[in-house]
Amino acid sequence: MVPAFITRLDEAVAHYCLKRCHNIRDLQRYAKRRIPRPMFDYMDGAADDEVTLNRNQSDFNRYDLLPRYLVDVGEIDPSTEIMGQHIELPIVLAPTGMSRLFNNDGEIAASAAAADAGTVYSLSTLSTYSIEEVAEVCSGPKWFQLYVFRDRDLILEFFERCRAVKYHALILTIDVPVPGNRERDLYSGMTIPPQLSLASYLDFFLHPLWSLKYVLSRQPFQLSNVAHKAPVDDRDVTTLVEYLQKQFDPTVKWDDAAWMVEQWQGPFAVKGIASVEDAVRAADIGANAVILSNHGGRQLDSAASPISLL
């Protein structure tokens, strides 16, 4: 249990800093100061030379806004509908794995914030809080992201768990046929198994609030959705990540995705689309939506940015 005074101090610091964040770059700079460097680089970094990461951002500057004036803007309604669900903002939180690396409340905090904003929260298979734990705190619409695993029974188990706690839609991620070569992680030692450098350990001491909250929580860091697949006495995150890495199937084809659509029988999106041809294939197998994505540049460098694909 984290002492109350540490929690209050951490929240006060966060509130003070967030009030001074006015754009995404401010948030990025604040995160860099607030969490240890290995965790920040894991979150902020991308594959190889990070060409795709930079392209994802810079390509937005290639496009102009063409406003139309002398129209009634007395009442603005940004709400919309996506895969049959009404949301208050045309923004959806994408799935992010291992969120407790960045904040001890991880997916619990992010999903609650999404619900407060009236939009969708997408939970990753690699989450540090489980499907059920997130459902308990997230009153808003929920989607679950997964991959095509070698163990098809594991996929069906996820389907049943999601149905039981009313996840509305599934997201199939297809752009991770092999792990990405993220050089920042190699430098810091954020690998499987971890090989943290001396500089990385020193950085933990330079971020005492983050370190204290993590240590004093006494909560094991694990991939909660698959924790039951490891021996009871060996459920650390390294064991579970190694288990999941063995589950990734490089032989996956569109027929496997079609099988998942048929088994789920509900709203289904395919994430990682990077070509018109694959978007058409996704529609052909019965997907309700496609998500243009290059995984934030984390898997394949020199890929096209999603906005340029539009």
For each predicted feature, which ranges?
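An N-cap/entry alpha-helix motif that binds or orients negatively charged groups
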Residues: V2-G84, M190-V252
